[in-house]
Amino acid sequence: MPRKGHIAKRDVLPDPLYNSKVVTKLINSIMLDGKRGVAQKICYDAFEIIGEKSGKDAMEVFETAMNNIMPLLEVKARRIGGATYQVPIEVRPERRQTLGIRWMLIAARKRGERSMRERLAGELLDASNNTGAAVKKREDTHKMAEANKAFAHYRY
């Protein structure tokens, strides 16, 4: 814990093409070894593929997909009297977005298509239709929270 008070959170700049902070966060998450140019190309190419396949605006599909992936509840382990309980808690908006992007990329990387841009486009299209591995991860998280609803009174 810092002794000099709260550390200011650094804000990301919106990306140049879509003017969206969420797209910038997606690009930052795709990026490996500091290669932002490669990450941007993957992201923008995936958005182009989405536009071709769906015939809709890529940003609309992306926003729908993100809303379908972002979790509302999650469980957190809480130790009380020697027993560890999985306590359901609401997810803060910032964390919802981060988890959504993380789950989407994990699911995209596990897919079978040849290139990352095709995998990402496929996962985003699936997520916008409420299918795919990332949406399943969200449903599993919600089921876990629902199953442990009895321990909700142990919330932090």
UniProtKB/Swiss-Prot annotation:
PROSITE patterns: RIBOSOMAL_S7 (PS00052). It comes from the Bacteria. The keyword Signal does not apply. Transmembrane segments: none annotated. InterPro entries: Ribosomal_uS7 (IPR000235), Ribosomal_uS7_bac/org-type (IPR005717), Ribosomal_uS7_CS (IPR020606), Ribosomal_uS7_dom (IPR023798), Ribosomal_uS7_dom_sf (IPR036823). One of its GO terms (biological process) is translation. Keywords: Ribonucleoprotein, Ribosomal protein, RNA-binding, rRNA-binding, tRNA-binding. It holds the Pfam family Ribosomal_S7. GO terms for cellular component: small ribosomal subunit. Part of the 30S ribosomal subunit. Contacts proteins S9 and S11. One of the primary rRNA binding proteins, it binds directly to 16S rRNA where it nucleates assembly of the head domain of the 30S subunit. Is located at the subunit interface close to the decoding center, probably blocks exit of the E-site tRNA. NCBIfam families: rpsG_bact. This is Small ribosomal subunit protein uS7. It comes from Clostridium botulinum (strain Okra / Type B1).
